[in-house]
């Protein structure tokens, strides 16, 4: 006769078998739904692509008709209505496509291959965006503290290398995460994307710059600038995140909009006090570029890193300054 303990084990196994049957059935249904989902995604993507092509052709035809024929007022109004409806339809397709798999861009393809990075629910998209914002905040604070230590406590090329390596890793990670967010509907584009690629290059060159007279002549200026930049980025995150939250609640901003290291039109209400901080930082970038160009002409300058750091600082200044200036100019034009 079996012992009570063995009988309990047999009974438990029987219960596990029943649960196992349920698990198998659930998993079968799950795989079936996945196959159905893949078919729906393919069909939806194809239909949207065809519609977008037709809309593009229609826009071209309307433009040609408007420019070639002297239209009566009624026709002009009809063309305006059609163009407006086309723009609305394009925005709707943009929203739809953010939930559909898409081919990765060149950068993501090089880094991740052909892995699908599209998140399929609003919750997962927002969670990833929120995690990205927290990552920026925490790393900005760490970089601010580390730049302070390197500037005022430890004068060592080793700690400087650690700081520069952290900058390279930080900006590389930002570019990857931003590319994933763009694939999922975030509308960060233009200069604010390119800005981080340039920062990655600049940090990499700073990391390879050997210790010497030229490095020591620029070191304190660079670390002081890094401290100030981290401080301004912290201010921007703190105030932009609050502003974005209010605008999302009012339905004036998209859920996937991100904080940026600059000034955009939506920041005009409540965030104009940041402009002096931004302009000061941008002219500091110009000052860094001028300093490096002067060092490049120094008789003892032999390092290629000097000129290769000066150029990115100059590009940073031009991009940041004129992008900010354009936003301010457009806002004043609208008000007038």
From Swiss-Prot:
GO terms for cellular component: endoplasmic reticulum; nuclear inner membrane; plasma membrane. It is a multi-pass membrane protein. It comes from the Eukaryota. InterPro entries: TMEM120A/B. GO terms for biological process: detection of mechanical stimulus involved in sensory perception of pain; monoatomic ion transmembrane transport. Residues 1-131, 177-189, 240-269, 330-336 are cytoplasmic. CoA binds at residues 129, 186-187, 236, 239-240, 331. It is found in: Cell membrane; Nucleus inner membrane; Endoplasmic reticulum. Homodimer. Multifunctional protein involved in mechanosensation, and plays an essential role in lipid metabolism. May function as a potential ion channel involved in sensing mechanical stimuli. TMEM120A is structurally similar to a lipid-modifying enzyme, ELOVL7, and contains a bound coenzyme A molecule, which suggests it might function as an enzyme in lipid metabolism. This is Transmembrane protein 120A. The gene is tmem120a.
